[in-house]
A protein has these predicted regions:
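Active-site neighborhood of HAD-like aspartate-dependent phosphohydrolases
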Residues: 1-33
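An amphipathic alpha-helix signature
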Residues: 13, 17, 37-45, 64, ...
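Conserved phosphate-coupling serine/threonine residues in phosphotransfer and NTP-handling enzymes
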Residues: 4, 103-105
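Helix-loop "lid/cap" segments that line or gate small-molecule binding pockets
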Residues: 17-20, 41-55, 113, 145
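Short beta->alpha linker loops
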Residues: 11, 35-39, 66, 80-84, ...
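Metal-dependent phosphoesterase signature
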Residues: 48-87, 95
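Short helix-capping segments at alpha-helix termini
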Residues: 22-25, 51-55, 95, 117-121, ...
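Asp-based, Mg2+/Mn2+-dependent phosphohydrolase catalytic module
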Residues: 90-93, 106-220
Length: 220
């Protein structure tokens, strides 16, 4: 969701910097980049390590709650779509393609985002705090595929981050990579595109067939 469908990473920049100021420090660009696509827990660990703070669980939980409340207020002011994202979702829905939103964002904040962009696009939604292990573990994608009644290998993931791409691949799904703020390395089961505006339903079907074929050709 963040950085794939909506241009929310800039809002996360604002809230992350505000949190660090509240904690008495400054977040370096390198540390911020390392948090992109991360779970709430991993982000807090990175922030506390960056600021040299003791990673006390209660303090990190309070910081996470503050961060998500602040970010939610920014989300509710309006989330800008990334180029081509809304149009592609509408085409997929019209074509009858079931869609799952798979995000490391917590459920409470995801609901605030869905209030802004519309939840009607998605057949199912899976959030980072609803699985045992968030991305880069495969759990979120495996859960989404299960809810859709599919195997993950029957699904095509669209991701913008190293973390999300790793999660999709670990689940067995080929990936369309649309890099946003962080470069994502290439791979045999990844198709890089510069923007979702380049894609329509037939393009996605062709990419899925191509990447799935490459996976089938790999030695056991």
């Amino acid at each position: 969701m963040d950085g794939t469908l909506v241009d929310s990473e800039k809002l996360w920049d604002v809230s992350m910097n505000a949190l660090c100021a509240r904690l008495g420090g400054v977040l370096s660009p390198e540390a911020r980049e390392a948090t992109v696509g991360g779970s709430s827990e991993s982000v807090m660990r990175a922030v506390y390590a960056e600021l040299g703070l003791e990673p006390e669980p209660a303090a990190m939980a309070e910081s996470a709650d503050w961060l998500h409340d602040y970010t939610g207020e920014l989300f509710e002011a309006g989330l800008p779509w990334l180029p081509g994202a809304q149009e592609l979702l509408e085409k997929l829905v019209t074509a009858g393609v079931p869609l799952a939103l798979v995000t490391n964002t917590r459920r409470d904040l995801t609901e605030r985002a869905l209030n802004s962009i519309g939840r009607h696009y998605f057949s199912v939604t899976v959030c980072g705090d609803e699985v045992v292990h968030a991305k880069p573990a495969p759990d979120p994608y495996l859960r989404a595929a299960e809810l859709l009644g599919l195997d993950a290998s029957q699904c095509l993931a669209i991701e913008d981050s190293v973390t999300g791409t790793a999660a999709a691949e670990a689940a067995g799904a080929p990936v369309v990579v649309v890099p946003n703020d962080v470069d994502v390395p290439g791979g045999p089961h990844r198709k890089h595109v510069s923007s979702l505006s380049e894609l329509d339903v037939d393009d996605l079907r062709g990419i899925f067939a191509s990447l799935s074929g490459e996976r089938d050709e790999q030695p056991a």
